[in-house]
């Protein structure tokens, strides 16, 4: 449109110029022609075209004219030819030549001008294009420099500017196309390097996880130490008001608390490094920014989470020897804490890379694995100190992660499982302690030679006896050395159990209940078992058993002081809160019963040993007139033993004495009726009667006080009536009154009488070969045979009745 308008504007001008050329003298044509070249750059071409058109018009007119004047032209030509030789001389020819020469210079100058104008225009265009391209080249050079310096985020921003701002301006140039083709490759290189950098950064984070966790756990422990120190100081003030018999060990342990608190406060002053101080997160941030700028955050998030989950699995997999030392558990916990502290840091400093839902899912997965690992490896721990240190680590571990918002209730539930295991290890340890105490005890009353020694024992064991206090030195405590040691060790066990119950976020009531239950286990399972094993040991004699019974009595009385001791350290009132009672009463009562039974057994065994020394001449004609030596030794032994029994409770001594007499009576009866004994003379019966009389005298001498009347003598009533029957030979009375409640020989068994009578009958036959020639002997023999028949009838009747 613009060209057409321009053309319309130049037509009248060209016509004017043509008119001037046609109407102007030839010498003045130069300025007119110059005006043509001064106009538009291509105007001379159009002018030439116009000139040609004008020439053609004139040619046509000339042709018309020539056609009109053709004949005349022919004639003129003919005439001209005639004058051709002279035409060159004409001035027109010379003028035309000069005109042509002058026009050539103008044409040359015109062409030079056109060429200069084109060059000028090209230079201007080049300058403009260079000014447009230079920023692109500079930005691309800047991009290359940023890539070489690994400033990828800045390079990415530069790349965006190139694509959005600079490249559209020069998109028509080939170099721009080449640059644009390199951008995807640069992006790919950038992403690959970022991934490599991220992988290295994540590996560095993993390597520093233990230091991060150690710093976090240390910080959590320091924050907790101050409050714990204050609480312990308050407990110390309360402990100083406790009863002297209940808090001796407590006060000794409480004296350490202020120093410990000061140490904790000194540690609080130390600077704790943060996670930013320990780990360089720039690779993560850089990669996140780059992928965010690329619009591919999801790929980066998936890659990051995938890599961190792999690291989590590595962290959660402990070494096989983790259970051997506390350092193994500490490294395991610090790595886990470091891992989740990093995740929490990423959660709070980034948007969307890590979400709360993701961290909770990861924590739940990790928590299940941690619990499984701890449950498996802690089962190998047999050292209570190691289990306690493990518990402290778990508490610090849980408190640390709880401070970062992770739920840790399942860890404290696990601690209750470990607490049972800890109690089991404590019970095993204290079983060894109790065994050592019992092995080292001399089972004799504790001798006291001075007031200081008396106070030492009183400070270790709650013993109150006004009569003993009034006695002068030297004197003896009724219990042996093991009693205060056992009491102290039970309190030490309570302390050891309390150490595990601390920091479990449980109320004082729950802690009190746990202490009482664990103490009950110690008493009912361990101490009771140790006592029973001690009682059943072969080398434990009657004196030791008596002392054990006395010891258990005092330990049973001390149980109320143990209950008060637990109440004091937990600050729980038994009146306001229902508390578990200690089972010391039943524990020591069972041990006493076992010791009493063992006393009865060993006493009977000792009686059997003496009875086995008996050496009767069952065919003697007359007795020696004095009791057998073995029996007198036995009675003397029983007297000395029962003197030791004076320290026992009355019923125990009475039962032991009655049991011994009954066993002695039974043993003598069995000796008399032994089937291997075929013959017994009346002299042997008389000798045996003398021994039984000594037994009756011993029973009537009240070797143990507390028996009423002849209660103890009744133990020998069966022997006495049987021997009286044979000594008096009162068979008519026995047979006549048999079965009557008021019978004189009510305790004589027909079978026993028959057995003994048959032994005596055989002796009579053997010793009285000529008895058949004496009437009295024949009558006695007939009486024996008659009595034997009647006794056999009674025995048969008893069997049928049964």
Swiss-Prot record:
The keyword Transferase is annotated on this UniProt entry: no
GO annotations of cellular component type: exocyst; Flemming body; growth cone; perinuclear region of cytoplasm; plasma membrane
Gene3D superfamilies registered for this protein in UniProt: Dsl1p vesicle tethering complex, Tip20p subunit, domain D (1.20.58.670), Exocyst complex subunit Sec15 C-terminal domain, N-terminal subdomain (1.10.357.30)
Subcellular localization, as worded in the UniProt entry: Cytoplasm; Cytoplasm, Perinuclear region; Cell projection, Growth cone; Midbody, Midbody ring
Transmembrane segments: none
Annotated family: Belongs to the SEC15 family.
Known role: Component of the exocyst complex involved in the docking of exocytic vesicles with fusion sites on the plasma membrane. Together with RAB11A, RAB3IP, RAB8A, PARD3, PRKCI, ANXA2, CDC42 and DNMBP promotes transcytosis of PODXL to the apical membrane initiation sites (AMIS), apical surface formation and lumenogenesis.
Name of this chain's protein: Exocyst complex component 6
Protein's organism: Mus musculus (Mouse)
